[in-house]
């Protein structure tokens, strides 16, 4: 019986990995230019990190985490998101005790159980950033602008930035009560999950994907109409800064995000080119998450962007190269007896100088080797022929024109190295 990848997971094959490398290269350049340093946390954490960090009332913790006990009886969870693990690392290593703000980024796989869909996998990849120690609106605006800059560098179009403020512990209780009073008469018609959310955290009802729940919550009180002065001023400043930077956005008073730790600014980026599951990233401020995980009062803000969704959007917008195979610089073809040692030695010399070299391993005819070279899209082929070797020469063919020239065997490595160095310059 053939064993396949687990449901909800996908292999990233050689023809696809080039696209991922493009994303990763863009991420590294972006983060360097914005002053972020990389952090890498374990793929699994103590379950308490997510129960205390993400929130016990969230769908993620209640329905979607991969939980298990190790042989020592410890409760562990495959990470469903990157913020809580980053906060755990911040506290464990006292990164907050140095110069502030602390600006971190990460990429890697996350895990959530759910019904697999085209853009909803059980193992998926995120690019995220976190900023700790800065509470002013300027860092909120920078984080949002940075997310949009990432998409812009990839060439993505037709994206919409949704923006909201969901208040803070000072003003949210009054809003929760107003929302609860609005929903109470309709409670019997809500889905079973939202009936439970009514008392635990009624804001989750606004995030429900059930169509009937969405209909029942139409006309509900909005967070922006219940903000305290501090939150209202903060939100006004964020909008002013985004306007000054030319970052377009749409206000969405139903946007609450799916995690309990958010305060004040919340945002989401959507693409209409990937179907109903249109979110390709989002984030917000979480000024009390560090305390919730046992640390001092350190404000934070960040985002998480789904990379599979980014790639799907790029594909649907025609931004992915159809031929994504790795291009080699040079192919070495062998023709005749006694050519292998020379060809192999030349290949190793060139590789050590940074030239990407492919060669034949299957003892094929010269004609078949040239077809292989064409498939690799190499600009040049070196033919190591039995007759030429007797004369101390090699043949260099330019694939674009078909022109050939002979080069001395003893000077071949230096000549070819200079050829590619000049092309790069």
Swiss-Prot record:
Q: Kindly give the SUPFAM superfamilies that the UniProt entry links to this protein.
A: Class II aaRS ABD-related, Class II aaRS and biotin synthetases
Q: Which UniProt keywords apply?
A: Aminoacyl-tRNA synthetase, ATP-binding, Cytoplasm, Ligase, Nucleotide-binding, Protein biosynthesis
Which GO terms of the molecular function aspect are on file?
A: ATP binding; catalytic activity, acting on a protein; histidine-tRNA ligase activity; transferase activity
Q: Which reaction does it catalyse?
A: tRNA(His) + L-histidine + ATP = L-histidyl-tRNA(His) + AMP + diphosphate + H(+)
A Gene Ontology BP annotation from the UniProt entry: histidyl-tRNA aminoacylation
Q: Does the keyword Endoplasmic reticulum apply?
A: no
Chief site of localization: cytoplasm
Q: Which domain of life is it from?
A: Bacteria
Q: Could you say which EC number(s) this protein's record lists?
A: 6.1.1.21
Q: Does the keyword Thylakoid apply?
A: no
Pull one GO CC term from this UniProt entry: cytoplasm
NCBIfam families (alphabetical): hisS
User: Subunit structure, briefly?
Assistant: Homodimer.
* Family label: Belongs to the class-II aminoacyl-tRNA synthetase family.
The protein, known as: Histidine--tRNA ligase
Which species is the source of this protein?
Heliobacterium modesticaldum (strain ATCC 51547 / Ice1)
């Amino acid at each position: 019986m053939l064993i396949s990848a687990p449901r909800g997971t996908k292999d990233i094959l050689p023809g696809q990995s080039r696209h991922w490398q493009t994303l990763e290269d863009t991420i590294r350049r972006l983060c360097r230019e914005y002053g972020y340093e990389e952090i890498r946390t374990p793929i699994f954490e103590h379950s308490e990190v997510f129960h205390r960090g993400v929130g016990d009332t969230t769908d993620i913790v209640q329905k979607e985490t991969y939980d298990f006990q190790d042989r020592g009886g410890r409760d562990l969870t495959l990470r469903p998101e990157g913020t809580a693990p980053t906060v755990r690392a911040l506290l464990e290593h006292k990164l907050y005790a140095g110069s502030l703000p602390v600006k971190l980024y990460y990429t890697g796989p996350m895990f959530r159980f759910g019904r697999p869909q085209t853009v909803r996998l059980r193992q998926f990849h995120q690019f995220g950033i976190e900023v700790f120690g800065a509470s002013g609106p300027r860092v909120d605006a920078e984080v949002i602008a940075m997310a949009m800059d990432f998409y812009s560098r990839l060439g993505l179009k037709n994206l919409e930035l949704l923006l909201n403020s969901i208040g803070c512990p000072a003003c949210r209780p009054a809003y929760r009560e107003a929302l609860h009073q609005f929903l109470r008469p309709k409670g019997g018609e809500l889905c079973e999950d939202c009936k439970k959310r009514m008392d635990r955290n009624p804001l989750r009802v606004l995030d429900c994907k059930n169509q009937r729940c969405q209909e029942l919550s139409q006309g509900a009180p909005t967070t922006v109409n219940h903000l305290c002065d501090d939150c209202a001023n903060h939100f006004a400043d964020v909008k002013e800064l985004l306007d000054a930077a030319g970052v377009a956005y749409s206000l969405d008073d139903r946007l609450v995000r799916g995690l309990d730790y958010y305060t004040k600014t919340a945002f989401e980026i959507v693409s209409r080119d990937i179907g109903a599951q249109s979110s390709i990233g989002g984030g917000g401020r979480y000024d009390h998450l560090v305390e919730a995980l046992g640390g001092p009062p350190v404000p934070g803000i960040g985002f998480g962007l789904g990379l599979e969704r980014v790639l799907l959007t790029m594909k649907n917008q025609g931004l992915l190269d159809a031929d994504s195979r790795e291009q080699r610089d040079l192919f070495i073809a062998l023709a005749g007896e006694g050519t292998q040692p020379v060809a192999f030695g030349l290949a190793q010399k060139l590789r050590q100088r940074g030239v990407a070299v492919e060669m034949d391993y299957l003892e094929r005819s010269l004609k078949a080797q040239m077809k292989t070279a064409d498939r690799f899209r190499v600009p040049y082929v070196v033919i190591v022929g039995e007759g030429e070797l007797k004369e101390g020469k090699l043949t260099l063919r330019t694939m674009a024109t078909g022109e050939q020239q002979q080069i001395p065997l003893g000077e071949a490595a230096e000549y070819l190295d200079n050829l590619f160095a000049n092309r790069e310059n």
